[in-house]
Amino acid sequence: MNWSNPMGEKMGYCKPTFMNIPQEKREKILSVAVNEFAYNGFENANINTIAKKAEVSVGSLYKYFDTKTDLFLTSVDYALNNLEIIMETIVESDEDVMIKLEKLIRVAIEFSRRNTVLIKLYNEVTSESKAELVKKIAEHVESITSQAYKKAVIDGQVAGEIRTDIDPGMAAFFVDNLLMNIQFSYACDYYCERYKIYAGEDIFQKDEFAIENILRFIKAALKSNQ
């Protein structure tokens, strides 16, 4: 991920001082924070532990982030930014909707395999119980992708590729839920075991089989008969 440029509005949870330190140091702090939050959750993650593993002082961390929440949200950005960029690029292309969906499924599987800890953090985000933090996370994480998916559905309806008797927002919500579940099923222990129970012990060696069946399911639900 390129952190050489200042964070935009979407990545606005760190202090300017964080962007003034070397990129390698920023990467180390956030990599450590991602692991700590992914495996311990927001409440149990320890700032002292993060500082120690990142080889910075606790005081320095608070020079970079006002609160633990700000560090958490910046870590979420760090974890999901690359995936969001890839998915948005696919969604905003001029390709047919079903081609876009196939690419999104492939990206979800490949990214989850290569970035298990990042997806574990995403899973932790979705199970957070602190109401104020949940609202902030949902608005922060879902706002861009929800609009991109909704636009893709509307464009598909206009082009006659997607049936028009389905609300675009609901269709986008269901597609995003499916993609999110795919990511968890290739990275998070419980979801992996659940996936094997439903699809067979060898499902992780049958990517094309999985992609084909997921697409068949989506097409049956969304594809226009025109």
Question: Which residues are covered by each model-predicted region?
Answer:
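Hydrophobic alpha-helical connector segments
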Residues: 74, 88-117, 168-175, 208
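Amphipathic alpha-helical packing segments from all-alpha helical-bundle domains
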Residues: 81-84, 88-89, 132-161, 169-173, ...
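Short secondary-structure transition hinges
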Residues: 109-148, 170-172, 200-204
